[in-house]
Design a protein with these regions (language model features):
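Hot-dog-fold acyl-thioester-processing enzymes
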Residues: 1-67, 121-233, 295-311
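Hydrophobic beta-strand-centered segment that forms part of the acyl-chain substrate-binding groove
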Residues: 48-98, 206-255, 282-285, 289
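HotDog/MaoC-like acyl-thioester-processing domains
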Residues: 1-18, 80-81, 86-151, 240-311
Length: 311
């Protein structure tokens, strides 16, 4: 019987966000903050898990994965430092350019599900399917000033260097990350003898998330706070990859959807990444969820909004 999927080993991702701060307070990745919100520990940031899929996707899609790859994931269960997780990828038909991916803990708990594929004509991803089912939402409190279609009023210049501290949101350097990355690769390294086929080091897929988020959001993306946020869904799509270390890029952001559940309010932010020739090289979709319980006075404000609408 032919094998239906391939997988990596059980690996233990390392937490680098213990000291993360935003809006003047610590994040969910701090043990004390996580405990105060009822979580069993400070979770590993979701994008950390993306690196474990790279060897599998390189095996399936070859070097084209680094040029036009797309990884699209729905985070289902948190992972805590010390836990081991394994990445899986379904083996697609020979003609297919997209496949299913997932990650599990040692006890079988599913950490994430999603899809991965290559371009240039990207097929419908798992998040495309998820977004098509979103219902219209109203009575938002934390995101009352965030609307679908809202475009950022700023364009940011961003880059990642080996020893560049990425700020309060990501209090570490690329060199720090490479010392603990779950799946090392010589193409990420600074040493000349380890240079990639492109002649210079490439940015790991998980660090593209850092590249597009370390500067924060445009000033007109106004989220009420203090409030605690976390990644719920994420997609990174390359059109002209890979992205390179020490290369400057321009990014623009746009809200393409808002939604909510019983516990969170969320926005879906698309970041467009342009190279120095103003060519679109990547898109990064982040569904950021904000915990209602972490915003003081949430219920009172909700009643006020609901009451004014009912009148």
């Amino acid at each position: 019987m032919d094998k239906e999927f391939i997988n990596g080993d059980f690996l233990s991702p390392i937490q680098l966000l213990n000291n993360q701060k935003y809006d003047g307070h610590k994040s969910l990745h701090d043990e004390e903050m996580a405990d105060s919100l009822g979580f069993s520990g400070a979770p590993i940031e979701g994008c950390t898990h993306l690196s474990q899929f790279v060897p599998l996707l390189e095996e399936i899609f070859k070097d084209e994965w680094f040029v036009s790859g797309c990884i699209s994931v729905h985070y289902k269960n948190m992972v805590f430092e010390g836990e081991r997780v394994k990445a899986f990828a379904k083996l697609p038909d020979e003609e297919s350019k997209i496949t299913d991916i997932w990650m599990e803990k040692e006890d079988g708990t599913v950490v994430l599900t999603g899809s991965a594929g290559i371009g240039p004509n990207h097929q419908t991803s798992s998040l495309d399917n998820l977004m098509s089912k979103l219902d219209k939402t109203e009575n938002l409190v934390i995101l009352s000033e965030i609307n679908e279609g809202l475009e950022g009023n700023e364009r940011f210049t961003v880059k990642i260097g080996f020893d560049q501290h990425m700020g309060d949101l990501y209090p570490f350097t690329l060199r720090n990350k490479l010392s603990v990355i779950t799946e090392p690769m010589t193409w990420y390294n600074e040493a000349e003898e380890n240079s990639s086929p492109w002649g210079r080091p490439i940015i790991p897929i998980e660090m593209i998330s850092v590249l597009t988020n370390y500067v924060g959001n445009p000033s007109n993306f106004k989220v009420k706070g203090p409030v605690i946020g976390l990644f719920a869904n994420q997609e990174i799509k390359l059109f002209k990859g890979p992205l390179f270390v020490n290369e400057e890029y321009q990014i623009e952001k746009k809200i393409i959807a808002v939604s909510q559940s019983k516990r969170v309010e969320t926005y879906w932010c698309m970041t467009y990444v342009y190279d120095q020739n103003k060519i679109l090289v990547a898109e990064c979709l982040l569904n950021q969820a904000f915990l209602k319980d972490s915003y003081e006075g949430y219920e009172e404000e909700l009643k006020s909004i609901s009451g004014s609408i009912n009148i």
